[in-house]
Structures are given as structure tokens and as C-alpha cells.
Amino acid sequence: MIDQKLLSILVCPVSKAPLEFVADKQELVCAASGLAYPIRDGIPVMLETEARELTLEEKEQYSH
């Protein structure tokens, strides 16, 4: 679980858009950039080189 205060101040380093926490995958997802940032040992890894691209299905799911 990620601290809600931390989540409220973190933004995607690529798009500067807000992030959504996905607990079952332990990732922070940015719908705007289509990237998912991993959380390792409770620490968000906010590097573009460490992020994975969202699938088309995921992009549709997270673009509210």
C-alpha cells in the first residue's frame, strides 16, 4: 500500500499528470503518458527507463 499523501504529490515525470495506484500489480499508472511505474520494496521507481508501456486494454481501463 502506498501512502495517500505521497500519492497526492507524485506526478508522472513524463507528462506531469497524476498517478493511479494499482495495488495488485504494485504500480503507479499514468493514463496520460501510457506508462506504469513499478513500486519496489514500498518505494516508487519514478524513472521513465524503468516504466513499462500500458497495453491497449490498460490504456482504456485507466483513461477515466
UniProtKB/Swiss-Prot annotation:
GO terms for cellular component: cytosol. It comes from the Bacteria. InterPro entries: Trm112-like. Pfam families: Trm112p. HAMAP family: UPF0434. Belongs to the UPF0434 family. This is UPF0434 protein TERTU_2813. It comes from Teredinibacter turnerae (strain ATCC 39867 / T7901).
